[in-house]
Amino acid sequence: MIKENTLKIFLSNGITLTVKENEKIFIKGQEESFAELYELIATCISNKNNVEFSVEIDHEYEDENKKKKHQVVKHEYFIPSEKITWFMIEEV
């Protein structure tokens, strides 16, 4: 079994965000790296700005006829700045 890298972001308001290596991160409509997301969160906390980003997940599955299918699911995140005082990232 191949291990897939997963990064977890723990926020001070109790929310945990999980982003897997194969998921695409979008900030203001542009695809970005996990490092860019980290920088966005750090900057927003210090500047007291809201954090907005989305994650697209390409799910691959088999239908009832055993044909491979793809479904892209988009998750939008909006985190008010006053809700976050610190964050921590862990690779699992």
Positions of predicted regions on the chain:
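Eukaryotic intrinsically disordered, low-complexity regulatory linkers and tails enriched in Ser/Thr/Pro
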Residues: 1-92
